[in-house]
């Protein structure tokens, strides 16, 4: 019958007879069936800018205080921001930017409302309810924070 080893002796024996595993860097395509040598972490937050979850309008929530069907708020549209583009103008008091899904939120805006909850013309958008700062925004790092372990 084999002799039972205590943990310290077993650990010493294993360390004495083991050797470090070699590592190599390979492309993702070559990684199938392999084991990571170390955790892989996000190098930056995803998304790395605040963006819109809807096609709609980005504006200052403070401009909608008191908005209702009886007392709507109309804002001037200062620019249109398609997905894949970056804003060139800031949103200021009384203004909004037309924004498409995934587009970055312009400077000064702190809320987004979907098209279907507004009435709009070529140059204005009308809102019928108050909004709060942060409503309908995808925040920096909302999907993945920087340094989050992505793979083990």
Predicted regions and their residues:
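Short, low-complexity N-terminal leaders and the immediately following helix N-cap/first helix
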Residues: 1-69, 75
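Short, glycine/charged-enriched hinge/interface segments at domain edges or termini
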Residues: 2, 58-152
């Amino acid at each position: 019958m084999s002799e039972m080893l205590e943990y310290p002796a077993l650990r010493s024996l294993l360390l004495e007879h083991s050797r470090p595993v070699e590592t190599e860097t390979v492309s993702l395509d070559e990684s199938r069936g392999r084991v990571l040598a170390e955790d892989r972490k996000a190098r930056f937050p995803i998304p790395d800018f605040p963006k819109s979850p809807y096609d709609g309008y980005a504006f200052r929530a403070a401009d909608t205080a008191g908005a209702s069907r009886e007392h709507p708020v109309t804002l001037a549209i200062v620019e249109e921001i398609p997905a894949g583009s970056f804003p060139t103008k800031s949103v200021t008091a009384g203004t909004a930017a037309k924004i498409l899904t995934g587009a970055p939120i312009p400077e000064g805006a702190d809320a987004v409302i979907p098209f279907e909850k507004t009435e709009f013309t070529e140059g204005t958008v009308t809102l019928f309810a108050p909004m709060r700062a942060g409503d309908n925004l995808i925040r920096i790092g909302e999907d993945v924070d920087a340094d989050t372990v992505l793979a083990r």
